[in-house]
Structures are given as structure tokens and as C-alpha cells.
Amino acid sequence: MAVPKKKTSNAKRDQRKAHWKRTAALEAQKALSLGKSVLSGRSNSFVYPQDEEEDDEE
């Protein structure tokens, strides 16, 4: 079974965590920006159903 030869240094561990947190923060910022764009109604890049009442049954 494969095992690590030496203990990972604290600096390397912190560097990996910082990279993960930075990536997560950027994705969260993108998601928030996207949500604001959709809610403001100024977005043209999304296609979703409008709240139109259609009376096709008559």
C-alpha cells in the first residue's frame, strides 16, 4: 500500500489550503455577481420562462 515517505511541511499545507480558499472565494464572487445580474433583470444571456398568462384553452 502506498504511503507518503515524509511529512508534508506546514508551509506546503498552508499553500494548498490558501489556493483552495482563493479558488472558492472567486467562484462565490462569480455566483453572487451572476445572481445579482439575473435578479436585476438586465441580463440578456439567460432564457427562462416569462410570467405570461396564456389562455389557449378557450
Swiss-Prot record:
> What family does this belong to?
Belongs to the bacterial ribosomal protein bL32 family.
**HAMAP family to which the protein is assigned, alphabetical:** Ribosomal_bL32 (MF_00340)
Q: Which InterPro entries match?
A: Ribosomal_bL32 (IPR002677), Ribosomal_bL32_plant/cyanobact (IPR044958), Ribosomal_zn-bd (IPR011332)
Q: Which SUPFAM superfamilies match?
A: Zn-binding ribosomal proteins
- A Pfam match: Ribosomal_L32p
Q: What is this protein called?
A: Large ribosomal subunit protein bL32
Listed GO biological process terms: translation
- Keywords attached to this entry: Ribonucleoprotein, Ribosomal protein
One GO cellular component from the entry?
A: large ribosomal subunit
Molecular function as annotated in GO: structural constituent of ribosome
For region Disordered, the annotated ranges are 1-22, 39-58
